A protein has these predicted regions:
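Short glycine-rich anion-binding loops that position phosphate/pyrophosphate groups of nucleotides
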Residues: 15, 83-85, 108, 201-203
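N-terminal glycine-rich phosphate/adenylate-binding segment common to multiple enzyme folds
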Residues: 71-76, 80, 85-88
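Catalytic core of DAGKc-family lipid kinases
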Residues: 107-193
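Gly/Ser/Thr-rich active-site loops/lids in small-molecule metabolic enzymes
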Residues: 185-232
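ATP/NTP phosphate-donor binding region
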Residues: 1-76, 117-132, 143-151, 156-158
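Short glycine/serine/threonine-rich phosphate/pyrophosphate-binding segments
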Residues: 19, 84-90, 204-209
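Redox-cofactor binding/interface segments in oxidoreductases and associated redox assembly factors
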Residues: 10, 79, 197
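Gly/Ser-rich helix-loop-strand patches that form or flank binding pockets
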Residues: 88, 92-106, 110
Length: 232
């Protein structure tokens, strides 16, 4: 990793009030490596940890901003939590090309695999330019709706997906029937409880629980995984 990190944003799991100690450790590591780095803490994370704007942690001043403001002003997002926390933040900062680093505070971490006890070594190495950037695929999800065949479709939902997108039967008791197209070419009709479209990262999440394939993170691929399909 050759990009110089000048601004770091810290994001925590919502409503987690036990993050001050680890945030303090991060500040100490950063101060030891490069005290000129500007440190930011996401607003709700700061509130839960009783951190005030312009206060000092170690010898570094704290800046507090919302996620929306931070994504366009930081180089690195340090996320404290499990995979769910990382997924939520990654989706919000992806459009700005921010590097994401996960420190596991949950029970299981496929993407937040950095141990809090190894911060001095691992975070320090990254800040010295010795880190390796691992790129992960994402895709855009759009939901179009029209009242009849002649009416123009309206775009009612649009969002990036880091893990997966799921079309499901919801609360209805019967199966759904889905016509699947790839690049406007018909593939097949699936009858069942739903369909998961997942990235390589998402292949170890919901898709894995319904016997989907595990895809290597470096592959540029999407998996289509039926949920409880009606098939012989």
């Amino acid at each position: 990793m050759t990009t110089k990190i000048n601004k770091i944003g810290i994001f925590g799991k919502p409503n987690n009030k036990n993050l001050y100690e680890i945030i303090e450790k991060i500040f100490i590591v950063v101060e030891n490596i490069d005290p000129k780095i500007h440190m930011f803490v996401e607003k709700s994370t700061a509130e839960c940890s009783s951190i005030k704007s312009k206060m000092f942690i170690s010898k570094l001043s704290v800046n507090i901003e919302t996620v929306e403001n931070l994504k366009n002003s930081i180089d690195l997002a340090v996320i404290l939590g499990g995979d769910g926390t990382l997924l939520g933040i990654a989706r919000q900062v992806a459009s700005a090309g921010v590097y994401v680093l996960g420190i596991n505070q949950g029970k299981l971490g496929f993407t937040t695999d950095l141990d809090v006890n190894d911060l001095q070594h691992n975070l320090g190495s990254l800040l010295r330019g010795e880190g390796i950037v691992e790129k992960r695929s994402m895709f855009d999800v759009r939901v179009l709706r029209k009242k009849n065949k002649t009416e123009e479709a309206l775009d009612i939902f649009n969002a990036p997906a880091f893990n997966d997108a799921v079309v499901s039967r919801g609360a209805i008791s019967h199966m759904v029937e889905l016509d699947v197209f790839i690049d406007n070419s018909y593939l097949q009709t699936i009858r069942g409880d739903g369909l998961i479209v997942c990235t390589p990262t998402g292949s170890t999440a919901y898709a894995l629980s319904v016997n989907g394939p595990i895809i290597h993170p470096n592959l540029e691929a999407l998996a289509l995984v039926p949920v409880a399909p009606q098939a012989l």
